[in-house]
């Protein structure tokens, strides 16, 4: 779902950068995720003692950690290098919804005005996909979906955002 949406945005003129994650089995047309952003998010989660599929809340004080400050610095540098001359750009990583407060700091440092696109898809479709790709249990998949959706909705309140139903996209 998010890969299809990101590709549509790309076809409409959103620059995704040159360092995109390679396609893989189960997503043969590509993930459309900036590899550098994915790597920085993975490093930050690791330093917080978490992984991409951890449904727990992030630590309340994570933004004040050295790991978060390092991530902000790395993201600002990466985005300046890749998108400085680009009028319209975007990045996608399903974990971004967990880090919106951190990304606000990145956008402030870049003097960028973010807009958010939240894709609404039936949770059981996502759980099925996670089970096929990662052998994730239904209960864990539902917890992860709920964590991502609640954090994305809450963190993007008051910001420029659009909510799009997956079925309407397809």
Predicted regions and their residues:
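PAPS-dependent sulfotransferase catalytic core
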Residues: 1-73
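PAPS-dependent sulfotransferase catalytic domain
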Residues: 50, 69-170
């Amino acid at each position: 779902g998010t890969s299809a949406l990101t590709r549509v945005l790309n076809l409409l003129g959103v620059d995704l950068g040159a360092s995109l994650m390679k396609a893989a089995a189960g997503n043969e047309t590509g993930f459309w995720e900036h590899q550098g952003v994915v790597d920085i998010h993975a490093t930050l989660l690791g330093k917080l003692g978490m992984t991409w599929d951890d449904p727990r809340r992030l630590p309340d004080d994570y933004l004040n950690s050295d790991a978060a400050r390092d991530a902000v610095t790395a993201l600002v540098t990466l985005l300046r290098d890749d998108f400085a001359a680009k009028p319209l750009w975007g990045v996608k990583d399903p974990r971004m919804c967990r880090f919106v407060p951190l990304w606000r700091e990145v956008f402030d440092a870049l003097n960028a005005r973010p807009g958010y696109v939240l894709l609404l898809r039936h949770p059981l479709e996502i759980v099925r996909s996670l089970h096929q790709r990662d052998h994730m249990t239904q209960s864990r998949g539902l917890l992860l979906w709920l964590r991502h959706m609640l954090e994305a909705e809450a963190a993007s309140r008051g910001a420029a955002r659009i909510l799009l139903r997956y079925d309407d996209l397809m």
